[in-house]
């Protein structure tokens, strides 16, 4: 009976969380921040509990490909394992007629918890523009990212829509700080640090 209650609680908590491949409110700016690769950590509040994830991304021609993994402490319902892969490719370049740059995003991931496993395939478009601060090496990218996410597994399926709002802040040549939040079928906030190579 206890496993059934925990399974139901995890499904209820995890179903709305579908921003990126692991269901946390970590979103992507339309730009590649790194030259060759990046390694980082994300701490997020996906609506219930706290999630901690590590990530690694590389650039492959026009695509950025990454893996992420971590844990989500779901406020009394146990700890879920988070696993995902993400991709991003540039789709729009700003012009006189359209002021934003854009990137197509695609992911696949899982929230694994005892018998309550959820799988996600988020598809989105990130739109934003880099702002360089005059006389400084600091720059930032404010962006928004609508995401449509099919969610399935453990007898549960849904189609979720959310909008991520975020800013990537380049504080040094090899360090990005990132903040994002979600609106829509999910909510939550995240902060990340990425070490750029």
Give each language-model segment a name:
Residues 79-81:
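Phosphate/oxyanion-binding active-site loops and adjacent basic polyanion-contact surfaces
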Residues 84-86:
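Extracytoplasmic beta-rich ectodomain segments of secreted or membrane-anchored proteins
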């Amino acid at each position: 009976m206890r496993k059934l209650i925990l399974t139901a609680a995890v499904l209820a908590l995890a179903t709305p969380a579908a921003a990126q491949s692991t269901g946390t409110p970590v979103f992507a700016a339309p730009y590649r921040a790194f030259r060759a690769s990046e390694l980082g950590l994300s701490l997020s509040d996906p609506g219930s509990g706290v999630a901690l994830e590590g990530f690694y991304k590389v650039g492959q021609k026009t695509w950025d490909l990454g893996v992420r993994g971590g844990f989500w402490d779901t406020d009394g319902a146990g700890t879920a394992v988070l696993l995902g892969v993400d991709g991003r490719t540039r789709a729009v370049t700003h012009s006189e007629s359209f002021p934003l740059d854009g990137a197509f995003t695609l992911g696949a991931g899982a929230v694994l918890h005892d018998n309550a496993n959820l799988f996600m395939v988020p598809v989105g478009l990130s739109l934003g523009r880099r702002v360089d601060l005059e006389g400084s090496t600091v720059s930032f990218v404010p962006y928004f990212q609508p995401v449509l996410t099919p969610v399935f597994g453990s007898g549960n399926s849904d189609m979720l829509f959310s909008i991520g709002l975020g800013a990537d802040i380049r504080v040094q040549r090899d360090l990005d700080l990132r903040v994002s939040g979600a609106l829509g079928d999910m909510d939550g906030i995240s902060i990340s640090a990425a070490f750029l190579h």
